[in-house]
Amino acid sequence: MRTMSLNIGTIHFVGIGGIGMSGIAEILHNLGYSVQGTDIADNYNVERLRKMGIRVHIGHAAEALGDARVVVVSSAVKADNPEVQAARAKLVPVVRRAEMLAELMRLKSAIAIGGTHGKTTTTSLIAALLDTARLDPTVINGGIINAYGTNARLGASEWMVVEADESDGSFIKLPSTAVVVTNIDPEHMDHYGTVERLHEAFRTFVENIPFYGFAAMCIDHPEVQALVARVPDRKLVTYGFNHQALVRVEKLSMDITGARYDVVITDRVTGATRTIADIHLPMYGEHNVLNSLAAIAVANELGLPNDVVKTALGGFKGVKRRFTRTGEAKGVTVIDDYGHHPVEIAAVLKAARSACQGNVIAVVQPHRYSRLSSLFAEFCTCFNDADMVIVADVYAAGEKPMEGFDKAALVKGLQEHGHRRVMALADSKALAPLVNSLAGPGDMVVCLGAGNITSWAHALPADLAALPDPSPGGAE
């Protein structure tokens, strides 16, 4: 069954190198559709798509549209984009990314993972469980799954696992058989305007599942627990550390290899319980344990056996830019993480604290002036588990600077909120010398942000190794 004819013509993606756009483009290409696209610069995703035979033009221009018969855009693409303008002049339909994703989902029984944080890892964990059960799912994720080397794969079964992006509200249009809600925090307020509208969008996301579907919901988060009470006529499976959760953790311990725990599953109708004992998850942090509980809740609803759950989680290879170890130099471990919201930063640093024997040094590149502005108080209090904080310039992501919300303001704000060791980073070239003066064997440097700080994290081990050891009692 197809919803779109293969003869629809060329599908053109504006911003094809984006993590969400590239996944959809890859799946469409693998299904046999003619796909092309543009982006402002080469990146990993662009090169990957080119190797598959997809044409990608660097730079945005009306001529790049060619003979495309439909144009796909993300929320980041503005109406004045020359390709969008050319498409509309030619009466070529321009559709949002979520609309094209919805077309793919109509072919499958889809599980959509939503929430402010944890979507990408949870999507990857659910995909791993279905893979291990030999259910061969189609997957479209918001991050590179290390086991695949890509953020998308085309499977042969009826199942599909997708990350649902709530940033522009279009996730409510996704036709899902089941959904996951990991948490709900104030984010993307430039779109929603009010917290109430954000909450209402998540309510719609859950209520849109069919009567035979289900929603896995983390009731450790107060807004998700409140949402549970507002959705009476759908099957809801709660999970968390909360003792009232239907899927909950017991006997949690963590060491250098990750987390070990039991999971108790309660039947919401009969009250009967069963336990999956001695699960090993090779990831750090309670937030990742919660992500695994979401996957276990889904697995339980699909009837997957305990040994599949334990094998899949125990062999999980992680997601690119989610607590990714980029290397070690002079006994200092360097971590790259996508965390850019205060809740994510706090969770990552808590995980680093549990995994590190020495000092935790956070290097943060704030992402967008608007986010730093709207969550400034939270940014000033989310670094408590870091012994030292290095603050880089804001990664603008196309935004104009906002007075009073920049690198200097965050340094000052952290100091005023009681953080004892905070310093500004002059530029990326200054990072290795600064870390060299601060870090010692057993320490961990955690690079945080959604911008180009990932390249700094990957370069840092070699840059650090090339520097002479600092003199005793070196710079503070």
Curated annotation (Swiss-Prot):
Q: What is this protein called?
A: UDP-N-acetylmuramate--L-alanine ligase
Which organism is this protein's natural source?
Paramagnetospirillum magneticum (strain ATCC 700264 / AMB-1)
The protein's location, in the record's own words, is: Cytoplasm
Asked if Cell inner membrane is a keyword of the record, the answer is: no
A Gene Ontology biological process annotation? Answer: peptidoglycan biosynthetic process
Its EC number(s): 6.3.2.8
Does the keyword field hold Cell cycle?
yes
Name of encoding gene: murC
The biological pathway it contributes to is: Cell wall biogenesis; peptidoglycan biosynthesis
Family label: Belongs to the MurCDEF family.
What are the record's GO terms for cellular component? Answer: cytoplasm
